[in-house]
């Protein structure tokens, strides 16, 4: 499955991002500065560049002159966020597995919008996650997700609609059996792995899953 790595303009403290030669790498707006700092050469630079420093803007303009197909300049006023536009480009390149970095922190509304982008990926038959130094965020929708026996940390589940039905959690500290998880009661917060092959099943609905790493 072809993978897309997107670097956004949120917070990024990591000293490296795992990128394979076959990955399609997109720098979304201010994510270009992170790519430059980490020595990553993106296949595509995309955005309205409202969060880009002048020095980086000049470099992007120079790249655009040399290789026009590697830079997409978006209008400042548009329906799609820069991140959603980057995801659409990744999908058009045939990618179905997305790793999205620097998509959290900063302005809260952008973090929430990026979470919604994960739902969009599910609707397109793809999968993705938001990754930072402390957590990985992904979507569970009408499916069962399995975790390895050596999984560690905390797993929190939140309904992304009015309710998620038939939620079953197995082999974790707190289990559920065919429960209804609503968006007004945080029953899925801070579950823990116990050294067994755990699973989460959602019969109908969408859950946001946050896997938080232990210190």
Range-by-range predicted roles:
Residues 7, 26-28, 47, 72-73, ...:
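General beta-strand structural signal in soluble alpha/beta enzymes
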Residues 135, 140-215:
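Long, charged alpha-helical interface segments
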Residues 14, 80-84, 107-112:
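Short glycine/serine/threonine-rich phosphate/pyrophosphate-binding segments
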Residues 97-146:
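Anionic-ligand-binding alpha/beta catalytic cores of soluble enzymes and soluble regulatory domains
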Residues 30-37, 86-87, 114-118:
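Histidine-anchored nucleotide/phosphate-binding helix
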Residues 1-59:
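N-terminal beta-strand-loop-alpha-helix module at the start
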Residues 62, 69-92:
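Short phosphate-binding loop-to-helix
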Residues 36, 91-94:
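Non-catalytic positions within long, well-ordered alpha-helices that form the structural scaffold/packing
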């Amino acid at each position: 499955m072809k993978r897309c790595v997107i670097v956004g303009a949120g917070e990024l403290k990591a000293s490296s991002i795992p990128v394979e030669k076959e990955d399609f790498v997109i720098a979304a707006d201010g994510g270009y500065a992170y790519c430059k700092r980490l020595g990553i050469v993106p296949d595509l630079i995309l955005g309205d560049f409202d969060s880009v420093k002048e020095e980086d803007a000049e470099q992007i303009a120079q790249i655009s002159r040399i290789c026009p197909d590697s830079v997409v300049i978006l209008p400042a006023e548009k329906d799609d966020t820069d991140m959603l536009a980057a995801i659409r480009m990744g999908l058009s390149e045939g990618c179905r597995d997305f790793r999205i970095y620097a998509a959290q922190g900063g302005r809260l509304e952008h973090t929430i919008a990026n979470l919604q982008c994960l739902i969009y990926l599910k609707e397109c038959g793809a999968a993705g996650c938001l990754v930072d130094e402390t957590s990985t965020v992904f979507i569970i929708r009408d499916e069962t997700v399995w975790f390895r026996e050596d999984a560690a940390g905390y797993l929190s589940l939140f309904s992304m609609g009015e309710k998620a039905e038939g939620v079953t959690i197995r082999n974790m500290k707190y289990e559920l059996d065919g429960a209804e998880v609503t968006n007004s009661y945080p029953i899925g917060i801070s579950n823990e792995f116990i050294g067994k092959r755990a699973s989460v099943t959602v019969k109908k609905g969408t859950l946001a899953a946050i896997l938080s790493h232990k210190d």
